[in-house]
């Protein structure tokens, strides 16, 4: 599934804001609830049983039974993306386009920094094989041992944005 024109236009508009802004638009979508994560204001268990809220936020700070506001969800996402940036930027040893970095932030937000740090994707980035790195996103479509169509779609969109800097 290709990226919708609305998401594409929102990502293009976010480019001047940098990689975190790009990742945020990918995750939330142009309408705030039509992105790669969607939004749920009440905590729930994801497909692998992890307590989750808002745009995919996980952690001990989630209050079961609480209904989160849109502002609280956006604040959690901004905090989480800043954490992603702090966690993975030291491992990226070469200059990469902000669009590539934004696609990677969205990916790492979904799979976790630990998985990124040991990935072929990171190795390819540091070898300045940006296309090869972006192509690696297609390998990350499983959760709980099962391949998910939603993850396949997400990775194609992240890959497309990741490759924008190559065009």
UniProtKB/Swiss-Prot annotation:
It catalyses: Hydrolysis of (1->4)-beta-linkages between N-acetylmuramic acid and N-acetyl-D-glucosamine residues in a peptidoglycan and between N-acetyl-D-glucosamine residues in chitodextrins. It is a single-pass type II membrane protein. GO terms for cellular component: host cell plasma membrane; membrane. It is found in: Host cell inner membrane. The active site is at residues 37, 46. Keywords: Antimicrobial, Bacteriolytic enzyme, Cytolysis, Glycosidase, Host cell inner membrane, Host cell lysis by virus, Host cell membrane, Host membrane, Hydrolase, Membrane, Signal-anchor, Transmembrane, Transmembrane helix, Viral release from host cell. The chain crosses the membrane at residues 11-31. GO terms for biological process: cell wall macromolecule catabolic process; defense response to bacterium; killing of cells of another organism; peptidoglycan catabolic process. PANTHER family: LYSOZYME RRRD-RELATED (PTHR38107:SF3), PTHR38107. Signal-arrest-release (SAR) endolysin with lysozyme activity that degrades host peptidoglycans and participates with the pinholin and spanin proteins in the sequential events which lead to programmed host cell lysis releasing the mature viral particles. Once the pinholin has permeabilized the host cell membrane, the SAR-endolysin is released into the periplasm where it breaks down the peptidoglycan layer. The signal-anchor, which may also be an uncleaved signal sequence tethers the SAR-endolysin to the membrane until the latter is depolarized by the holin, resulting in the escape of SAR-endolysin from the membrane. This is SAR-endolysin. The lineage of its organism: Viruses, Duplodnaviria, Heunggongvirae, Uroviricota, Caudoviricetes.
